[in-house]
Amino acid sequence: MEYMLTRLEWLVGPDKIQTLKDTSIALFGVGGVGGGALEALVRAGVGRIVIIDGDSIAPSNLNRQMITTHDTIGARKVEVAKARALSINPDVVIETHDIMYIEEKYPGFIQSLNVDYVIDAIDMVTAKLSIIEVCQRESIPVISCMGGGNRFYPEKLMIADVNKSHTCPLARVMRRELKKRGIKKQLVLFSTEKPTKPQFRGEATSPGTCSFVPPVAGFILAAHVLRTILEVSEQ
């Protein structure tokens, strides 16, 4: 009899399905990038996902954030994300934390989550640095997303050590700040595409975004984590 994970089971086998069910992942940020990552993790049958995001849904999120519809505008992102995840897989355990994380404000938070992997899909540099510092200190695997705004080519996204990143302004800042903190290596997702100059700014302070680059970035992050957990290697 077919069930939700039948096609994935054909691909990886029953034992790997159980591995995914036994896996816990923390997802920091459930917006454009994080929403894509969440979708992939839930549909892959990951057993427990901890979602951390302290924001609410705005009308401007509709163009790129998978959890967003007109019906959810104004709602808290973590609650909408949880409802969507459970509507896809009622068996997934979803824990939510409606906070804007930084270690100074929430000491010991990441350690308390007891997860196998951390995905950083947030924008704030101070929070990204906190997440990476704690994860590296505690030997928790973590992958961090660099900038996805002002770009049109998702095929130019790639995963590499932060020291091999280029072109991305956020990655440049992260390289500098991580070096200051004595962190020599960190896996990141970044774009080799030179950011496009916005054609209209109005009162905007954030970069422009399209419908496809942020979610694809999220899927790539999730794909890397899932391959790592499943011990999939390229043929």
Model-derived features with residue positions:
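N-terminal charged helix/coil linker that caps or initiates catalytic domains
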Residues: 1-25
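Conserved N-terminal Rossmann-fold NAD(P)-binding element of oxidoreductases
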Residues: 27-29, 52
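Hydrophobic/small residue at the entry helix of a nucleotide-binding pocket
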Residues: 33-34
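Conserved S-adenosyl-L-methionine
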Residues: 42-48, 137
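Glycine-rich phosphate-binding loop and adjoining beta1-alpha1-beta2 segment
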Residues: 46-89
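Conserved SAM/SAH-binding loop
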Residues: 98-106
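Glycine-rich phosphate/adenylate-binding loop
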Residues: 111-117, 122-127, 134-138, 142, ...
